[in-house]
C-alpha cells in the first residue's frame, strides 16, 4: 500500500509500519527530509534512493535510525547488526552482537580472597 497523499501528521507518516506500507511525500531539500525522518518516536530502518553514495552517507549520518539501506530495503547482511533506536528498541539482531543479545552473556567479576 502506497500512501502518496497522506498528511504529515497521519499515522502512516509518523509510526512504524512492519508490513507492505510506505508513505511518500515531497520535500524541498535534504534538510527538510532529514527533519521529517527524525520527527518520529521510531527509528528502525531508513531506505535512501539515490545515485550519489556520498549524499546517502551524509544523510545516513544525520538520521536517527539503527539501519540504513541505499537503493534497497530487501536484504539483511547476517554479518551486520540489525538494530533500531528510539521507541523501536535497543539492542540488535543478527551478527555477533545479535547472537550475544539472544544468548544472554554473563559477566563474571571475581576477586580472590
Residue ranges and their predicted role:
Residues 1-113:
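Conserved C-terminal structural/oligomerization subdomain of aldehyde/semialdehyde dehydrogenase
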